[in-house]
């Protein structure tokens, strides 16, 4: 038996490149650190991987000639020629990665206006859906209600939702989902609020845990149900792992609120804290975990290899701690890391130089692809152990029965391990600053 082996490595030209397969042996394995995979030890189902259609990302895409714009969508969403994205996210109203503050409801008497989305965002999502073929699961998140619904009277700098506007905002979110669906953009899920504990200089809105619980229980949940939208998955928190358990458990411990909630979304900006995901999963095993945002802050640094390694570390950590899907932030940005209307520059897996009409894949693109191209929607994460020598790994079984194991080495020297699968084994070596995906034939 052989395992197909795909590699990306800093110090070679390998970029999702096939290299010599691994030969599987029987009998005693060598005295090496052990990665032990139990093919019968199935854990959570994997929904897939994806990124965000922000107004900024879609503006950058629109700055390119049509064939180059199509090539980027192919690179992300095509199941064979690309890296097989099947998840996506976008924002309700503007966010920091927009061209300025704007809302779909400019006043108390205004009706829903999706014209801003039809300029660039919806066309890009439609293009991705056409390329993907299979349905894309789209998650939508508000950064702020319209200014007139808030205590602060502005979309930026925090503030809270006015108590008198809770029903209004809940109904507005229902209208947004229905309006987008009428425009041919199917919504899979909704988060209550992006980063509800962050008072940002850009669009933000603060909720305490109890305020989020009460809004879900008394306003948003009933509104979604009354509108016939209760099949849309509702996620709480949508902020960092550090407080994911403490925040989510306030909502999920209330049965009247929890019945409306599919699961919890979270980000990476506070650090690893993967153990908090375990704690939340074990406390509420019937609810779900979804990574909803992560990116490198501080602008673009072309060619930096640590970009991809950070992604692999977090994807492996999240999947090994019950996460079911993984969403990157902006699909593409310009060479400065924008546009961003408050100067919050970030990096992205694809960087576009519109003046030259070219685009570049960062290491993060290749590293994400080691998961998203090969761990397919409907896969089951398998129980596996870590080698303990610096190699990080995760294993999954695809719906067709094929086995997928991703192994990453972020260190400065090659690392070896004995990979054992149900008693059979192979000796595996991963070069310094490299990642490998191993694929076994369907059983």
Stretch-by-stretch model annotation:
Residues 14-187, 208, 218:
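N-terminal catalytic cores of secreted or lumenal carbohydrate-active enzymes
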Residues 81-88, 133-137, 183-189, 229-233, ...:
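Loop/turn elements at helix/coil->beta-strand transitions in domains of secreted/extracellular proteins
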Residues 430-443:
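C-terminal beta-strand-rich structural cap/linker in extracellular carbohydrate-active enzymes
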């Amino acid at each position: 038996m052989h395992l197909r082996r795909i590699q990306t490595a800093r110090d070679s030209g390998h970029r999702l490149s096939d290299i010599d397969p691994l030969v599987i042996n029987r009998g005693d394995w060598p005295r090496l650190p052990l990665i032990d995979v139990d093919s019968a030890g199935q854990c959570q189902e994997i929904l897939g991987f994806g990124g965000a259609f922000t107004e900024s990302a879609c503006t950058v895409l629109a700055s390119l000639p049509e064939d180059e714009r199509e090539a980027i969508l192919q690179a992300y969403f095509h199941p064979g020629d690309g890296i097989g994205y099947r998840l996506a996210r976008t924002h309700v109203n503007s966010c920091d990665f927009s061209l300025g503050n704007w809302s779909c409801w400019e006043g108390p008497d205004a009706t829903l206006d999706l014209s801003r989305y039809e300029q660039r965002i919806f066309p890009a999502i439609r293009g991705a859906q056409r390329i993907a073929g299979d349905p894309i699961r789209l998650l939508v998140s508000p950064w702020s209600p319209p200014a007139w619904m808030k205590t602060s009277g502005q979309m930026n700098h925090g503030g809270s939702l006015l108590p008198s506007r809770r029903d209004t905002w809940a109904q507005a979110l229902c209208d947004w989902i229905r309006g987008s669906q009428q425009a041919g953009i199917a919504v899979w899920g909704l988060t209550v609020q992006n980063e509800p504990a962050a008072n940002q200089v850009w669009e933000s809105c603060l909720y305490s845990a109890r305020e989020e619980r009460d809004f879900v229980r008394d306003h948003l949940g009933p509104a979604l149900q009354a509108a016939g939208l209760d099949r849309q998955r509702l996620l709480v928190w949508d902020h960092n792992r550090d407080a994911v358990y403490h925040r989510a458990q306030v909502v999920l411990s209330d049965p009247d609120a929890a019945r409306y909630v599919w699961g919890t979304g979270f980000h990476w900006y506070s650090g690893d804290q993967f153990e908090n995901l375990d704690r939340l999963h074990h406390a509420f095993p019937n609810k779900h975990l979804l990574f909803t945002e992560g990116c490198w802050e501080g602008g673009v640094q072309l060619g930096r290899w640590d970009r991809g390694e950070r992604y692999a570390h977090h994807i492996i950590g999240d999947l090994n701690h019950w996460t079911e899907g993984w969403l990157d932030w902006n699909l593409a940005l310009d060479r400065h890391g924008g546009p961003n209307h408050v100067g919050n520059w970030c990096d992205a897996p694809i960087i576009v130089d519109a003046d030259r009409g070219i685009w570049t894949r960062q290491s993060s693109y290749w590293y994400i692809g080691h998961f998203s191209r090969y761990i397919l929607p409907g896969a089951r994460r398998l129980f596996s152990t870590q080698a303990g020598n610096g190699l990080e790994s995760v294993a999954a079984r695809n719906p067709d029965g094929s086995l997928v194991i991703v192994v990453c080495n972020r260190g400065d020297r090659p690392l070896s391990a004995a990979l054992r699968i149900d008693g059979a084994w192979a000796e595996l070596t991963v070069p310094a600053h490299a990642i490998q995906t191993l694929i076994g034939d369907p059983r």
